[in-house]
Amino acid sequence: MKRQRVVVKIGSSSLTDPKGGLCHDKLLDHVQAIAYMKQLGHDIILITSGAVAAGFGPLGYPTRPTTIAGKQAAAAVGQSLLMQAYSAQFAQFGFTAAQLLLTRSDFYSRERFRNLFATITTLLEHGAVPIINENDSVSVEELTFGDNDMLSALVAGFLHADALVLLTDINGLYDANPKTNPQAKKYAFLPEITSEMLASAGGSGSTVGTGGMRSKLLAAQKALSFGVSVFIGTGSGKEKLADILAGKGDGTYIGVPFPKQMQMRKQWIAYHAPVSGTITVDSGAEEALLDRGKSLLPAGVTAVSGDFHAMDVVNVINEKGVTIGRGQVYYAAADLKKVKGRPSEEARQYSYLHRPEVIHRDNWVTLRKERVKR
């Protein structure tokens, strides 16, 4: 097997005992599997839940707290306990654990986005195991990832991972709830995540976690959009991750083995950059962007809204008001209003670096699957 870069996400239910406390035997099982993959030469990035689950007991809570303040306090205590456990276990196999606590704002700035990539890449080059969790102690609702499933998908995307492995206590996706319906059929492989699957998926199945099968499907959908294949399932023993990559995992495989991956810059434009305005384009420009791989020119712009500057990211909508994509503009809003509908040679004097395009193809991301019908 060629060297692969794999993001592994471990949920709270796969780390805790029946009372909700941190289970060191379960943690050791995961560490053994990751260490084995490292010994085989693979790059492994771990996204771990469990900070709140590890911390609420020592704080005196009988069960997982439900208030934001309670969860953040438990995370403050539990994160250090969780990392102590991981560091001690990985040290037994000769590997160093590295902690990274992230918030959603770390992805908004392109500079911080690039720095995060450089940091994780350097850790991998030096043989360390990056262990990532959301910084639950300081995150506010507007700046959260939602859960670690989505965080793992975003990390897998910008690291250009070969696969995202979502380890859970259920061995894959079913057409019904296997806990209540013994006739439920498991999907061994799915080419994509459909809206029907999302609608039928339930919420969290655990009292110690925030995610459920729906959140895993949303994460899988996001990872697939980046060009990352996904596995959702379970396993035990040191070879479980190797088995998963070899196609022998106990779960569901989603997506093609080696899809085309989205460039890191385009990931930032599509999913992380703040959107500063909206540009409306005519049908000709829509077809050029979606069907012919062209840049957006001033002649195709019919309306401009928002107070954006050159090099900001904006949404692009068609004449029906449907978002077709997102891109980084070479014109400030005030200047684009002056030149919309005009030829590029007349308009370029108002653009950043006198570029003829409003949005160059390299700074464009299509967000709509449908193509223009001819």
From Swiss-Prot:
A biological process term (GO) from this entry: L-proline biosynthetic process
GO molecular-function terms, A-Z: ATP binding; glutamate 5-kinase activity; RNA binding
Keyword set includes Transferase: yes
Binding site for ATP: K9, T168, D169, T210, G211, G212, M213, R214, S215, K216
Annotated SMART domains: PUA
Metabolic or biological pathway, per its Swiss-Prot or TrEMBL entry: Amino-acid biosynthesis; L-proline biosynthesis; L-glutamate 5-semialdehyde from L-glutamate: step 1/2
Entry-linked Gene3D superfamilies: Acetylglutamate kinase-like, PUA domain
Keyword Translocase listed: no
Chief place where the protein resides: cytoplasm
CDD domains: AAK_G5K_ProB (cd04242), PUA_G5K (cd21157)
Family: Belongs to the glutamate 5-kinase family.
Classification of source organism: Bacteria, Bacillati, Bacillota, Bacilli, Bacillales
Record protein name field: Glutamate 5-kinase
Pfam family, one: AA_kinase
Binding site for substrate: S49, D136, N148
Role: Catalyzes the transfer of a phosphate group to glutamate to form L-glutamate 5-phosphate.
Keyword annotations from UniProtKB, A to Z: Amino-acid biosynthesis, ATP-binding, Cytoplasm, Kinase, Nucleotide-binding, Proline biosynthesis, Transferase
UniProt xrefs under HAMAP family: ProB
EC number(s) from the headed UniProt entry: 2.7.2.11
PROSITE patterns: GLUTAMATE_5_KINASE, PUA
InterPro entries: AceGlu_kinase-like_sf, Asp/Glu/Uridylate_kinase, G5K_ProB, Glu/AcGlu_kinase, Glu_5kinase, Glu_5kinase/COase_Synthase, Glutamate_5-kinase_CS, PUA
